[in-house]
Amino acid sequence: MPDHLGDDMRKTKKDDTKEEEKNFQALDEGDIAVLKRYGQGPYAEQLKTLDADIENCLKKVNELSGVKESDTGLAPPALWDIAADKQAMQQEQPLQVARCTKIITSDKHDPRYLINVKQFAKFVVDLADSVAPTDIEEGMRVGVDRNKYQIHLPLPAKIDPTVTMMQVEEKPDVTYSDVGGCKDQIEKLREVVETPLLHPERYVNLGIEPPKGVLLYGPPGTGKTLCARAVANRTDACFIRVIGSELVQKYVGEGARMVRELFEMARTKKACLIFFDEIDAVGGARFDDGQGGDNEVQRTMLELINQLDGFDPRGNIKVLMATNRPDTLDPALMRPGRLDRKVEFALPDLAGRAHILKIHAKQMSVERDIRYDLLARLCPNSTGAEIRSVCTEAGMFAIRARRKVATEKDFLEAINKVVKGYAKFSATPRYLTHN
């Protein structure tokens, strides 16, 4: 039956389909391997092999230890040795906590130890065979048996769990490159914190002691706490973070006890860095209001002053304090020897504001031709926190317009909203008036 295609047209169409079938070729293994590697970095295969080796090592460790992922975190029942555990419990008797108050030495016999069992009695005892005489000191807590009250175990100092939880275990993810507009301040901090830990011989050769305390002060939102987080990420020393309001306790003497235990725990470390945030909560100038409401806060501050530079040496402990009201701090807390260096975090300049904008815009999906210097000129007397809010609002404008990329117009609208619209909420002029 004739159709709309002629014989010539039908021949040419068949020839085209044959040529297309000839042009299509199946992918071989080499082409598939190239496609799999497309978009990967030069070290992707090495990283994969390292990840596989790490997973295999973890599997071996879990198999040897008998611990598998479970809700209870216990080993499987097939690996339990209940008979050996019962025998160990029968051989090892429970110990009682006591305190060694005095060591009595004599030439005729071995030293004796005077222990005080709380709310019970005092005994003169000797050591068990498993304890060396050099492990026991006066004033330390020990574990004694209930029969002969022999000392079987030296115990660490008793520290409040709230103080132990102040220690930062995981390092923050903030580095010095994430802090903009604070180049001079970072250098001053590194001279106090990093140089004495990495190059102590420089100070020994000069015969001086490195500064041990730094006060960070400036308007709210200028990067004081952010710099402290960057210091915690950089140093390998133990980092303890304390908020000033945590030292204000209900009962008399609790705040001073927490400060003592805090420095006792810091002295047990090889090197320690303590950061007091919002120190004006406990470090205010002393005055008498006639009612005695601030007496407990003042006692806490006096204990802090004593620990910073009192009769006992501080040791290898660096102290950072941050506040936005330095005019309210007590002069005894501010003197050199306790806080040797005062670092002011002022408002960022034009280059600092542009750097802060680039830091926050680096994590965003933005256009490439944004003029950050122009945006920085439109944000006079703005802090780093306000500039970060500008970047967040620019992203909100892009989301509202259903776009995946923020434009320069979004940043301009965000500046009008944050810098100019929220000017009445800014505390920077009030801070500059007080200080």
UniProtKB/Swiss-Prot annotation:
Residues 1-24 are annotated as: Disordered. The 26S proteasome is involved in the ATP-dependent degradation of ubiquitinated proteins. The regulatory (or ATPase) complex confers ATP dependency and substrate specificity to the 26S complex. Belongs to the AAA ATPase family. Residues 1-23 have a biased composition (Basic and acidic residues). The keyword ATP-binding applies. Keywords: ATP-binding, Cytoplasm, Nucleotide-binding, Nucleus, Proteasome. One of its GO terms (biological process) is proteasome-mediated ubiquitin-dependent protein catabolic process. SMART domains: AAA. The keyword Iron does not apply. ATP binds at G218, P219, P220, G221, T222, G223, K224, T225. CDD domains: RecA-like_PAN_like (cd19502). This is 26S proteasome regulatory subunit 7. It is found in: Cytoplasm; Nucleus. One of its GO terms (molecular function) is ATP hydrolysis activity. GO terms for cellular component: cytoplasm; nucleus; proteasome complex; proteasome regulatory particle, base subcomplex.
